[in-house]
Amino acid sequence: MPFKIYKKYVMLLAFTAPALIFYAIFLLIPTISGMYYSFTDWNGLNPNYNFIGLGNFVESLKEDPDFLNSLWFTLKYVLVMIVLQNVLALVLAVLIESRTRSKGFFRTIFFMPNMISTIISAFMWTFVFSSVLPQIAEKTAIAFLGQSWLGDPKVSFFSIIIVSLWNGVGYMMIIYLASLQGVPQSLKEAAIIDGANAFQTLRSVTLPMITHAITICFFLTLNGAFKVYEVVYGLTGGGPGRSTQVITMNIYEEAFSNNFRYGYASAKSVILFAIVLIFTLIQLRVMKKREVEA
């Protein structure tokens, strides 16, 4: 091998090695270890453990109602977030893009909540739901605002959705805005000349041109919604009565609260990984197909 080519590969390895080492230590090795321990009864501390095969998986899917309830709640949360977050972000992006002078102001205002930590946002909204809204209801006689936003299982889900949207819509809006700026103005003008109204222009011209951004936003929303933890922990802690417990909270509880069943929690993590992988592959396949058609 010539010295120049050898030197080139050495330089590439020198620059990429630190990142690869950190990736292996903090992501690859823990992932492989978690998959291995999911087939054991390890408690996370004792070096002696037994290989139990698929026992943890069978127990979690057949004999653990708390896990199944948290899985169902998480799936419901994911579905609502995918729809609402992307629709709201796209609507805001279109409205802001249509403005000329105040575009920067509104872009900053709607993005600011994303700059606040999720757990801090949850604590802020806890105060709003438990103190501010009841006082407004008392002084204005609007009974709707005085309901138990965090204590009622039927209402607490919507409280979590509200805070999640408030915290995450701005980020998706920025992605859509960046994509909208790449849509040629001449195409919109041609559609208007042909008699298309604003909605028809959006549906037939704008949306096909930003399908790649929609794919990215759908993927980010799907990934983030399945991993949700802080907002639920800060608002309800999974209550009342575990009615708002998401799957990540159930896994954490199993690993560090319920007799330190680390192997059992690892099995649940593998199940979550498989579910996210399946949903992601389906979503990417559908969206990529639409990108090609567009």
Go through the PLM ranges and name each one.
Residues 4-294:
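A structural signal for multi-pass alpha-helical bundles of membrane permease subunits
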